[in-house]
């Protein structure tokens, strides 16, 4: 099956972001904090969260999903960096569509050079989508994967290759405190 996080309940606290009867705008400026834990499917993370932890406290005011398009993917050989899964998560389409197979993060698409009118479809990743559609939407990506950062997340305003999970956490918290990012992607190898 194919999953995506397009259907979820909106918490009552954030459901209405229009204007009140007083005419004062209550428009909420939505932000995205994408926390990725390498190798962990959503249900495992959900069941491992401490009830009093920071993430659990954020959930009541959040839209989120514990299911993703890569949850059913298993690797025949475990690798440090998994370009196929990253491309699947960041483009929102299955590997057979995005055709990314290696750390170049370039689609491996076959086309006929004798047919200049042949249509080749490339799937934009979320960072490219953000940077191409609103230059004022600032994005931060912190992962330990240098090739992912260089080849797929390079359109973010700030992309940082971290040395470990503690550095990822500290960098993200520092940027949250000091800058106004609309989208933040933080990648961890485990649950701190």
Regions found by a protein language model. Give the residues of each.
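Loop/turn elements at helix/coil->beta-strand transitions in domains of secreted/extracellular proteins
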Residues: 28-33, 56, 60-67, 84, ...
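Catalytic-adjacent loop/helix segments of enzymes that bind and process anionic phosphate/sulfate esters
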Residues: 117-123, 134-135, 140-192
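Active-site nucleophile/metal-coordination loop of metallo-enzymes that catalyze phosphate/sulfate
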Residues: 13-27, 42-129
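Active-site-proximal beta-strand/loop segments in catalytic clefts of secreted hydrolases
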Residues: 35-40, 69-73, 92-93, 103-105, ...
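Boundary/entry segment of secreted carbohydrate-active catalytic domains
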Residues: 29-34, 38, 44
């Amino acid at each position: 099956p194919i999953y995506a996080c397009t259907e979820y309940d909106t918490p009552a606290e954030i459901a209405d972001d229009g204007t009140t009867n007083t005419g004062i705008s209550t428009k909420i400026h939505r932000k995205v904090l994408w926390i990725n834990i390498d190798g962990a499917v959503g249900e495992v993370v959900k069941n491992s969260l401490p009830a009093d932890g920071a993430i659990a406290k954020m959930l009541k005011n959040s839209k989120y999903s514990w299911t993703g398009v890569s949850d059913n993917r298993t690797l025949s050989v475990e690798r440090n960096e998994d370009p196929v899964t990253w491309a699947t998560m960041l483009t929102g389409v299955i590997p057979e569509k995005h055709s990314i197979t290696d750390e170049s993060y370039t689609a491996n698409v076959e086309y006929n050079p004798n047919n200049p009118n042949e249509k080749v479809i490339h799937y934009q990743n979320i960072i490219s989508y953000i940077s191409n559609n609103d230059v004022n939407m600032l994005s931060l990506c912190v992962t330990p994967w240098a090739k992912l950062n260089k080849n797929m997340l390079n359109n973010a305003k700030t992309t940082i290759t971290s040395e470990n999970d503690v550095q990822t956490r500290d960098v993200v918290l520092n940027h949250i405190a000091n800058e106004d990012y609309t989208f933040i992607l933080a990648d961890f190898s485990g649950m701190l």
